[in-house]
From Swiss-Prot:
Signal peptide: none annotated. This is Ribonuclease HII. A divalent metal cation binds at residues 89-90, 185. It catalyses: Endonucleolytic cleavage to 5'-phosphomonoester. It comes from Clostridium botulinum (strain Hall / ATCC 3502 / NCTC 13319 / Type A). Endonuclease that specifically degrades the RNA of RNA-DNA hybrids. Residues 83-269 form the RNase H type-2 domain. Belongs to the RNase HII family.
Length: 269
């Protein structure tokens, strides 16, 4: 759109143009968008000026996200630019039902800035819709990824601590490439024959760990929704097996299902 005669362009057309910029924006367009913002801010119409302010706010937010994402990539790259680094994380340690799931992800950490994956963070801080969108992107862009699980019966037999470590170990060992380094969230992975560094709050610092947390979360949530189709009384489709009041009351009323962790129910039954 040519904005040289901005005063003659209707507000709705300008708004449509502004919305399109936000949807299709790439960082290479930054200078062009800044020029557009300047023109909108000089318009005599208050609603057009507000569009310029909103576009400026969008641009600032984009730059903040670019910086945050670059920091997460650089956090991993500091271990070695030519290293294959795997991030590994688990989900489902605490639920009363279902498996514990882990994912390991190897990303190309040397990819050009604008080819990086944006909006990645701790999976718990993302909406379900955003996690599912990022899950697809991570799988497409990853050099390798692998998902592993330990079921509820094994958790009962071996304990949650063993199962937690085992599922992380399986996720890493199932990768199609052997990483030079494994970054794990919070604590080290025992009996792993690959160099391992554990990062406190790693899913908010490491792009590789955060990516693995998203894949693991989406995979497990999908599993629990499938289980819910035959066990709808427990509400697995929205509680994912965690001990909500609704879930606890359902266990007391209907008894445990085939996917419940009996060792977690001693204070309920």
């Amino acid at each position: 759109m040519n904005l040289n005669n901005l005063e003659n362009i209707r507000y709705n057309e300008i708004k449509e143009f502004s919305d399109k910029i936000k949807k299709e924006f790439t960082f290479s367009q930054k200078k062009q968008v800044m020029d557009i913002i300047e023109k909108l801010n000089k318009d005599s119409r208050k609603n057009v000026i507000k569009l310029g302010q909103a576009l400026e706010k969008f641009l600032n937010k984009y730059e903040e996200e670019l910086k945050r994402t670059n920091n997460m990539y650089n956090f991993d790259r500091r271990y070695g630019n030519n290293y294959l680094i795997a991030g590994v994380d688990e989900v489902g340690r605490g639920p009363l039902a279902g498996p514990i799931v882990a994912a390991a992800v190897v990303l190309d950490l040397n990819v050009e800035e604008m080819q990086r994956i944006f909006n990645i963070k701790d999976s718990k801080k993302l909406s379900e819709k955003k996690r599912e969108e990022l899950d697809i992107i991570i799988r497409e862009k990853a050099i390798s990824y692998n998902i592993a699980l330990v079921d509820n019966k094994t958790i009962d037999e071996r304990g949650i601590s063993w199962s937690n470590n085992e599922v992380l170990k399986r996720a890493v060992e199932g990768l199609k490439v052997k990483p030079d380094l494994v970054l794990s969230d919070g604590y080290a992975v025992k009996n792993l024959n690959i160099r391992n560094e554990f990062i406190i709050k790693g899913d908010s610092k490491s792009i590789s760990i955060a990516s693995s947390s998203i894949i693991a979360k989406v995979y497990r949530d999908s599993m629990m929704k499938e289980y819910s189709k035959g066990l709808n009384m427990y509400g697995f489709n929205h509680n994912a097996g965690y001990g909500t009041e609704e879930h606890v009351q359902a266990i007391k009323k209907h008894g445990p299902s085939k996917i419940h962790r009996m060792s977690f129910l001693t204070n309920i039954l």
